[in-house]
Amino acid sequence: MIIFKDVFPGVELFSDSFPVSLVNETVYKVKGKLRTDTFAIDDKAIGGNASAEGGEEGTDAASKQGVDIVMNSRLVEYALSKKDYMTHIKSYMKSVKDKLQETKPADSELFQKNVQPFIKEVLNDFKEYQLFCGESMGPEGMLALMKWDGETPYMFFFKHGLDEEKV
């Protein structure tokens, strides 16, 4: 299995256990699905004596619903205005570009060329996207994007802002 981590804070964003495709050699498109996790509390863990006279009053099960990618990687929703997102993405793209020029100069030009149309598409349809960051919530990290296509959530991650770790 491959775990994809944010280059800057180093937190896990997703793994290859989800269907992943590469868009324009720059953006990973990851297909998620809505799921509900139910957490039941064992009555024995609460303690006390069960009454022989009364009826059973157990504890209620709690549940949490969300997108599997978000829940598995403990991503945190991050609300930004379009203007604030533009400020963040400019700074983030510069950081990625600088990192690429140090480590993979050949990829730097490809990244700059191919990422611009995707960013433009996101900005044109910004209200349709939700933003998520890794659990460290570092300001220098990637903001992953999620957009719903009907009943299916898709998350988008910048390929060049990720490190791959085989486990």
From Swiss-Prot:
The keyword Lipoprotein appears for this protein: no
Keyword 4Fe-4S recorded: no
Induction: By cadmium.
Upper lineage: Eukaryota, Metazoa, Spiralia, Lophotrochozoa, Annelida
GO cellular component entries: cytoplasm
Principal location class: cytoplasm
Domain TCTP: residue ranges: 1-167
Biological role stated in the UniProt entry: Involved in calcium binding and microtubule stabilization.
The protein's name: Translationally-controlled tumor protein homolog
Pfam annotation, one family: TCTP
PROSITE patterns: TCTP_1 (PS01002), TCTP_2 (PS01003), TCTP_3 (PS51797)
An example Gene Ontology molecular-function term: calcium ion binding
